[in-house]
């Protein structure tokens, strides 16, 4: 605002554009001397503007007096200098939508400037959108929008580079809108699909359980359009009539009297996707949004990681029965809780068997060590029961070793394709600086997308899909045994508040160390400075719990290194192994839905033996949980897949060890009758790096897959250290 100009600003709710989102801005411009006054927005972490790009601007506005109000809309660069502007005139006392186009010129004229918005040069990374008023008057403003007009395959409202990164994975399906945001933080926060379609102004904003704001500019209609654009079958997930249990209020069910209306909403989604607009009101809404053709919905998820209790079972059964009766052609995907074991898992599978649910959604976030130890997890699945959809999985980091672990387990899932019918990595996208969960498959900032090692592994499978697969028994040095450190330290982390007193560490040689009390207030790692060496030891302490639902974690062993141990106190007791910087549960009790009472006291003893391979926990002198780590991890795997239609055989080789290894594939090639000519012309796509711990959250993977000739006349293939290889023969 220049000297002599004067204006005021306030937020109002009276007479809004949309009652669903009533808050809007009122700007009272008293006087303008020199430069105009107005509103500006720097976006999320600044706005990136690109040379040669055009931006679609829109806003709703009204002149309170009814007199015409001249408005200048401008894009400004990092220094506040204008890049593009346009003039509008707001006239009339009623709300109206005003639109214009803002075009950022190229610095110099050229005939060969790029036309792909992803390739255009960035001229501003901390840009600003300005709505400027040039005369005195009073104006109301709402729903201001500014989007680049470049679209990937014509898909509006999505960043082209992000959609491209997703499309290049060649996904067969996409699950949305996510996990815990589906059932929400209480009933008012439960994701209601029908509130995310239609005019965007009438989609009520909300928050989600991860703390993000949801404007629903991307709603269910846009998700279906995204799936259509990338040729992925949609898999929408709706709440099972119960909110998320991982909150202070626990799971809250939809009231019994409201369930018929909710079931109608679930069936309405199927109609919105598939019904005829001429005969169905929901389908007419789809047509009104510009898509009279059906979306061809085949799958519908009901529930996400829910607490499987009698209330959940009642709500789920009612939804399931109603959908099956109304739309038997829809394949319903059920849920069996957040982990691949435990009470919810067992109860979820019981319900699946009783109802004969076609597919159940399992979730599993585990360390690379856990995955390598459990490559046979699906070998023993019931072939006569529900099919398995591994709907959320990952290995808790973006390093190469994590990608290799995921490649190994994906090979085994592929070999168990008769029962593991679907799988999807999660989470998918994360904006740098705004992460509530790591790792993610694709990170991005305002300028570009970053593909992780996990991404490249997914892509190597997605571009070599097959219809038949077999595991291969591998002889020789496939086992990895970890050398655990003798270091004994102690630190505390967690999200709760607790006092830890009377802390005594006693080693197997009789050395005894008393540590100062710790008043922990959820304030990040608190270290004690303990530095001993021992193979076995005990830790005694008195834990007084004050508040917090996520517990307090006591780390022991080499707490500053990648391999140590954790004992967790809270709504459950849990022992964890941290290996290569990633943790997984060794043993634990069921998580209680009740909060820990403030002032609860536990007299705890943690037993650690064999340098952390063996753990046990006592509370008040009673054994609670215990477990022992299996020493050997299968770190070298081979699997075979066949694309019958394409006539191509894929040999997948994982070598997650520090030395290259020669793999004799001759028996496999002979068994598949691969001709000599095909063996001579094979190609290998190899993902590898010297450092297994290369790869950082939020950054591009340091290396990416490389394709090269692979002559297999002898049947021998040398797999590089720390590598995943897909050999194509055909």
Residue ranges and their predicted role:
Residues 122-217, 224-233:
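An acidic-aromatic substrate-binding cleft motif
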Residues 87, 634-676, 684, 725:
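Carbohydrate-binding surface patches
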Residues 9-24, 182-220, 247-264, 271, ...:
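Aromatic- and acidic-residue-enriched carbohydrate-binding clefts of CAZyme catalytic domains
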Residues 674-719:
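Acidic, Ser/Thr/Pro-rich beta/coil linker or hinge segments at domain junctions
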Residues 35-37, 44-168:
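Extended acidic/polar, glycine-enriched regions
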Residues 478-633:
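Extracellular glycan-recognition regions
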Residues 1, 25-27, 39-71, 96-103, ...:
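Extra-cytoplasmic beta-strand recognition segments
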Residues 226, 321-324, 328-331, 349-354, ...:
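Catalytic-core region of carbohydrate-active enzymes that cleave or remodel glycosidic bonds
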């Amino acid at each position: 605002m220049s000297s002599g100009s004067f204006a005021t600003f306030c937020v109002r709710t009276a007479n809004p554009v949309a009652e669903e989102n009533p808050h809007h801005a009122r700007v009272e411009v008293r006087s303008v001397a020199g430069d105009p006054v107005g509103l500006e927005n720097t976006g999320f972490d600044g706005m990136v503007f690109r040379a040669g790009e055009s931006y679609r601007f829109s806003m709703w506005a009204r002149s309170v007096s009814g007199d015409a109000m001249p408005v200048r809309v401008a894009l400004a660069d990092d220094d506040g200098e204008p890049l593009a502007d346009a003039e509008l005139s707001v006239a009339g006392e009623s709300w109206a939508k005003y639109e214009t186009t803002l075009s950022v010129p190229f610095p110099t004229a050229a005939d060969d400037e790029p036309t792909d918005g992803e390739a255009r040069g960035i001229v501003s990374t901390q840009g600003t959108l300005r709505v400027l008023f040039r005369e005195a008057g009073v104006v109301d403003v709402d729903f201001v929008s500014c989007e680049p007009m470049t679209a990937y395959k014509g898909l509006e409202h999505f960043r082209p580079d992000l959609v491209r990164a997703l499309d290049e994975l060649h996904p067969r399906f996409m699950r949305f809108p996510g996990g815990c945001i589906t059932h929400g933080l209480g009933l008012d926060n439960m994701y209601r699909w029908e509130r995310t379609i239609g005019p965007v102004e009438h989609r009520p904003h909300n928050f989600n359980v991860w703390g993000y704001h949801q404007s629903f500019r991307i709603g269910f209609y846009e998700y279906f359009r995204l799936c259509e654009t990338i040729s992925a079958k949609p898999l929408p997930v709706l709440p099972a009539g119960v909110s998320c249990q991982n909150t202070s209020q626990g799971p809250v069910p939809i009231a019994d009297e409201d369930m018929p209306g909710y079931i109608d909403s679930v069936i309405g989604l199927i109609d919105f996707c598939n019904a005829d607009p001429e005969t169905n009101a929901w389908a007419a809404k789809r047509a009104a949004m510009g898509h009279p053709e059906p979306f061809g919905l085949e799958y519908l998820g009901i529930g996400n990681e829910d607490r499987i209790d009698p209330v959940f079972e009642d709500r789920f059964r009612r939804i399931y029965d109603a959908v099956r009766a109304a739309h038997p052609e829809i394949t319903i995907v059920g849920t069996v809780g957040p982990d691949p074991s435990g009470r919810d898992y067992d109860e979820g599978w019981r319900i699946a068997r009783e109802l004969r649910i076609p597919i159940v959604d399992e979730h599993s976030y585990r360390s690379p060590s856990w995955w390598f130890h459990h490559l046979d997890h699906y070998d023993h699945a019931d072939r006569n029961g529900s099919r398995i959809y591994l709907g959320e999985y990952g290995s808790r980091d973006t390093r190469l070793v994590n990608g290799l672990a995921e490649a190994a387990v994906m090979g085994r899932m592929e070999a168990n394709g008769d029962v593991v019918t679907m799988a999807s990595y999660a989470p998918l996208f994360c904006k740098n600086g705004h992460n509530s969960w790591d790792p993610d498959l694709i990170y991005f900032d305002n300028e570009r997308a970053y593909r992780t090692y996990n991404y490249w592994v997914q892509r190597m499978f997605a571009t070599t899909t097959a219809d038949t697969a077999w595991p291969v028994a591998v002889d020789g040095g496939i086992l990895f045994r970890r050398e655990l450190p003798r270091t004994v330290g102690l630190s505390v982390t967690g999200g709760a508040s607790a006092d830890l007193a009377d802390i005594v560490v006693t080693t197997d040689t009789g050395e005894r160390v008393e540590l100062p009390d710790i008043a922990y207030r959820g304030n990040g790692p608190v270290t004690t400075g303990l530095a001993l060496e021992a193979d076995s030891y005990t830790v005694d302490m008195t834990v007084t719990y004050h508040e917090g639902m996520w517990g307090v974690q006591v780390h022991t062993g080499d707490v500053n290194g990648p391999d140590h141990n954790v004992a967790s106190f809270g709504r459950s007791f849990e022992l964890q192994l941290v290996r290569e910087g990633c943790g997984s549960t060794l043993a634990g009790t069921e998580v209680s839905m009740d909060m820990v009472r403030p002032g609860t006291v536990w007299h705890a003893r943690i037993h650690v033996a064999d340098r952390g391979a063996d753990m046990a926990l006592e509370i008040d002198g009673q054994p609670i949980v215990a477990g022992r780590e299996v020493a050997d991890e299968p770190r070298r795997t081979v699997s075979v897949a066949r694309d019958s239609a394409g006539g191509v055989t894929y040999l997948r080789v994982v070598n997650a060890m520090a030395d290259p290894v020669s793999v004799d594939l001759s028996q496999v090639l002979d068994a598949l009758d691969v001709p000599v000519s095909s063996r001579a012309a094979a190609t290998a796509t190899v993902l590898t790096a010297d450092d297994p711990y290369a790869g950082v959250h939020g950054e591009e993977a340091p290396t990416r897959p490389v394709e090269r000739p692979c002559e297999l006349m002898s049947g021998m293939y040398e797999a590089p250290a720390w590598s995943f290889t897909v050999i194509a023969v055909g």
